[in-house]
A protein has these predicted regions:
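Bacterial Sec-dependent N-terminal signal peptides
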Residues: 1-23
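Phosphate-group recognition and catalysis centered on beta-loop-alpha active-site segments
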Residues: 19-299
Length: 299
């Protein structure tokens, strides 16, 4: 009996060490300076094979070897943070209205829909449930969730996952600092910069002067010389580039569907890699991982 107990304890310790190493490895690739590895970020989890932003979709991403899963937050009537992208629950759940119109128990009584709009057995997850599932396995990118920055931070603190999370916002440094300065340096914060908007370069300069973020999410509908100049500016600053391949208007036309439907991965993901991107957010995580592995840019 003692041998069995010791064996079980050893297995648990090994699993814990592997989990800790997994997150440490992803963080090193995100925050360090010397890795060739490119991180794969799956947008709204594995929504092609499970309901978007669902625990099952996140499990699928973990099993694939995805590095980071993107989620969005809303708050329930009774103050719980849940994972939901849209303003309403109409498209993705069996109910109607806004998440804040319902208590968590009421939302849990509903079911998530799949990509075809059919009811599934899956429930809307809370942020706490997501972080506990992801703990030691995959990092989390909170995209539409800045309005709940402080509350999200409290959940990360409670679950021991502050080091697992990236929080983003498309806002200038001064506002982010004024609203969340007390916790800003305790998390990985990533600015989102639309390179076409007036003042984009000033936003970059201000962040570089005051914060020096580990990475920037850059959005650009064209790949003209001015966009490429700003991309180089961020890359040459030492920050990592986070580029979306979700649809053409986010990446100058070098999107997932170009890679998959037009069979032009080198003109899509390859082009993004050539700009120096170290994080690619995708709707095709399995295929992007396959592409990167062939280039020895991912395990």
């Amino acid at each position: 009996m003692k041998r069995i107990y010791n064996f079980i304890l050893l297995v648990c310790l090994v699993q814990l060490a592997v989990a800790q190493n997994r997150i440490a490895e992803i963080r090193e690739n995100l925050l360090g300076n010397y890795s060739d590895r490119v991180l794969v970020v799956s947008h709204r989890a594995d929504w092609r094979n499970a309901p978007e932003n669902s625990l099952q979709g996140i499990r699928n991403c973990i099993d694939m070897g995805v590095d980071m899963v993107e989620i969005d937050l809303k708050k329930t009537k009774d103050g719980h943070l849940v994972v939901m992208h849209d303003k309403t629950i109409n498209r993705t759940m069996t109910g109607k209205g806004n998440a804040e119109d319902y208590t968590l128990a009421e939302l849990k009584a509903m079911r998530l829909k799949n990509g075809a709009g059919c009811k599934t057995r899956h429930q809307i997850p809370t942020l706490e449930e997501v972080m506990l599932l992801c703990k030691g396995k995959i990092m989390v990118n909170i995209d539409k969730g800045y309005d709940y920055f402080q509350e999200a931070y409290a959940v990360l603190e409670k679950t021991g996952t502050i080091d697992h999370c990236v929080i983003k916002a498309g806002l200038p440094y001064e506002r982010v600092k004024a609203e969340n300065g007390d916790v800003l340096d305790k998390v990985i914060f990533m600015p989102i910069v639309n390179l076409h908007k007036e003042g984009a370069e000033k936003i970059i300069n201000d962040y570089q002067s005051h914060m020096k973020p580990a990475a920037y999410e850059l959005v650009f509908k064209d790949d003209n010389e001015e966009m490429l100049r700003l991309i180089r500016k961020v890359r040459d600053s030492g920050a990592k580039l986070f580029i979306n391949s979700l649809w053409p208007e986010l990446c100058g036309g070098h999107d997932d569907d170009r890679a998959v439907e037009l069979h032009q991965p080198d003109e899509s993901w390859g082009w993004i890699l050539n700009q120096g991107a170290k994080l690619i957010q995708t709707h095709r995580p399995a295929l992007l991982l396959e592409y990167l592995r062939k280039k020895k840019l991912h395990d």
